[in-house]
Design a protein with these regions (language model features):
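Expand to "…catalyze enediolate/carbanion chemistry for C-C bond making/breaking, isomerization
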Residues: 1-185
Length: 185
């Protein structure tokens, strides 16, 4: 992780920034990335700044709890949960966040969740996932991992045809759950 990139992202005039602790960080760099992102979240935040989201490792992954310990700070607006396949995975994180929020004291609002659906099982459960917690504000489609599970080559042209059903199903689930729909994770 490069501190310069974190600083630049947080200084942009955008609605939201997603900092990454998952696939975008090499295993040997995870501890450094956690420290840098944790420190960045602790710095000035509030009106006029982008919302701050962090993509943590997946529920059940050995690194997820260390990720949460590093980023659960007052400057965190939300998490991006990757590779979600069941509503129970959302509920696990919801419970962890509720405990942290209770211990941390009053906040302006609860930590929000954007959910990344990246597998056929997740796609089939998308509506239940999107409605598993009031924290869920967005549903994302991770085409690369989804395609990999289907054995498809990573090819944007093929993706347009082969992923049409999955993308459409995410849109329908997101609209039915009344959450934002984000593509291209």
């Amino acid at each position: 992780h490069r501190q310069r990139m974190i600083d630049k992202a947080l200084g942009l005039n955008v609605d939201a920034v997603m900092l990454d602790l998952e696939d975008g960080v090499a295993p040997s760099e995870k501890d450094t990335a956690r420290r840098q992102i944790g420190a960045a979240l602790a710095e000035a935040h509030g009106p006029g700044r982008p919302a701050r989201y962090v993509r943590v490792n997946a529920v059940g992954h050995e690194r997820m709890h260390a990720d949460l310990a590093a980023v659960l700070r007052p400057g965190l607006d939300g998490l991006v949960l990757p590779k979600v396949e069941t509503p129970e995975q959302v509920k696990i994180v919801d419970d962890l966040l509720a405990r942290w929020e209770q211990e941390a004291g009053p906040r302006r609002e609860a930590v929000r969740l954007n959910i990344a659906v990246e597998s056929p099982r997740g796609l089939l459960n998308a509506l239940q996932i999107a409605t598993a917690s009031r924290r869920v504000i967005g549903l994302m489609f991770g085409a690369e991992d989804f395609g990999r599970e289907l054995g498809l080559p990573v090819n944007r042209e093929a993706e347009a045809r082969e992923m049409l059903y999955a993308r459409s199903a995410i849109v329908i689930a997101g609209v039915a759950a009344r959450v934002q729909i984000i593509d291209g994770v």
